[in-house]
Amino acid sequence: VVSDYVAVDRLVDPFQVAADYTEAGIRSLKAGLDVEYPRPKGFSYRMKEAVEDGRLSMADIDQAVERVLTQKVKLGLFEDPYPHLDRLKALLHQKSTDELNEKMALESFILLKNERKTLPLSKKTKKIAVIGPHADVLRSYFGTFSYPAALDMTMAREEDGQGFDEPGLIVYDIEQKYPGQLRDCSPRLERRLQAEFAKCRTLYQALKEYLPDAEITYAKGINAVGSDLSGMEEALNTAAEADVVLFTIGGKNGWGITSTVGEGVDSTNIDLPGRQEEFARAVYALHKKTVVLHFDGRPLSNAFIASHFDAILEVWQPGMMGGQALCKVLFGDYNPAGRLPVTAARSVGQIPVYYAL
């Protein structure tokens, strides 16, 4: 039995059910916890002191140690303690796992709105514009507790020290700060993900393979967060020249101040981040056949988009084969679900939302 990160610490602060870390460690061990993550704060030298003064028995410690060692024996870690990278890599990109990834993505998509028979799109469409902050970003396909999100956080700290008073130091208890401009995905990160997830395709990349005879154009327009609109005119011009516009919106799911939602991130707003609504209004003013695709780790609510655009597809983070799966949904090779797994509030005033509502 292992703890959540800093769960033992939290018995002291903020929950205040233990007077100090020693008591927190003792109570956790006696309750059946075997390993404390991410570092020993309750399960530290304090355990030795607790045994010596009688607050903890060796039997309690022996039980935790025995369970950990038993698992290691079952896994063969004493005989062969090192991972075999060649075997691990061979497991990553098998046909069966690719098919499962695509199946999971297809089953996760939710058709929120489809008026005037906007979807499915015709495979004979000649010119398609793919715009918005998630149109050609692999990072958008992966959620908080994925390798790409962890890599994003690590690179952010390495490159510019966001979240740290002293760049380069390893700081565990980070006081989260929310700057006016969150970090967008760096080109370096995207190159790394493309190399390590060779079969992963963004929507823009997947469309070019799915419809080789169509003209697929792309312009990002704006970042998911921040106030920079310098690229919006290019995106609007790209959309204006297309027969169909695929408009990606949504936040960024990850760790801390690299993201708008995820681990260590709280929000008082359920609307689109940054200046995405302003962008959406400009896209709508073009009066083009448009499909809105919402990438995110949580449901958002925006009255303008909900009431003005004819087709809205909830994409979430569809994973490694998400781009290919999106093509199948958009062009009628797969029929998406219409059921939400969570309640989406219409406005922030409805929150907290209870199951009884």
Predicted ranges, named:
Residues 36-37, 59, 76-80, 116, ...:
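Residue-level signal for secondary-structure boundary elements
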Residues 1-14, 18-19, 27, 33-40:
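Short acidic/histidine-rich active-site segments
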Residues 21-33, 66-77:
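Conserved short secondary-structure transition element at the edge of the structured enzyme core
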Residues 1, 20, 53, 84-85, ...:
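General structural signal for secondary-structure boundaries
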Residues 5, 11-12, 18, 43-58, ...:
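C-terminal non-catalytic regions of proteins with extracellular/luminal or membrane-system context
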Residues 59, 79-107:
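Helix-enriched interaction subdomains in cytosolic or periplasmic regions
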Residues 44-45, 66, 70-89:
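Conserved, charged catalytic cores of large soluble enzymes
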